Amino acid sequence: ALWKDILKNAGKAALNEINQIVQ
């Protein structure tokens, strides 16, 4: 379960950076 949380957090961070770049 821990690795799932890590992947989830990494995915959120990546999406946040992508959104910042787009905007």
From Swiss-Prot:
One of its GO terms (biological process) is killing of cells of another organism. The modification Glutamine amide is found at residue 23. It is found in: Secreted. It comes from the Eukaryota. Antimicrobial peptide, active against the Gram-positive bacterium S.aureus, and the Gram-negative bacteria E.coli and P.aeruginosa. Has hemolytic activity (5% hemolysis at 128 ug/ml). One of its GO terms (cellular component) is extracellular region. This is Dermaseptin-4. The lineage of its organism: Eukaryota, Metazoa, Chordata, Craniata, Vertebrata. Belongs to the frog skin active peptide (FSAP) family. Dermaseptin subfamily. Keywords: Amidation, Amphibian defense peptide, Antibiotic, Antimicrobial, Cytolysis, Hemolysis, Secreted. Transmembrane segments: none annotated. Expressed by the skin glands. The keyword Acyltransferase does not apply. Its main location: secreted.
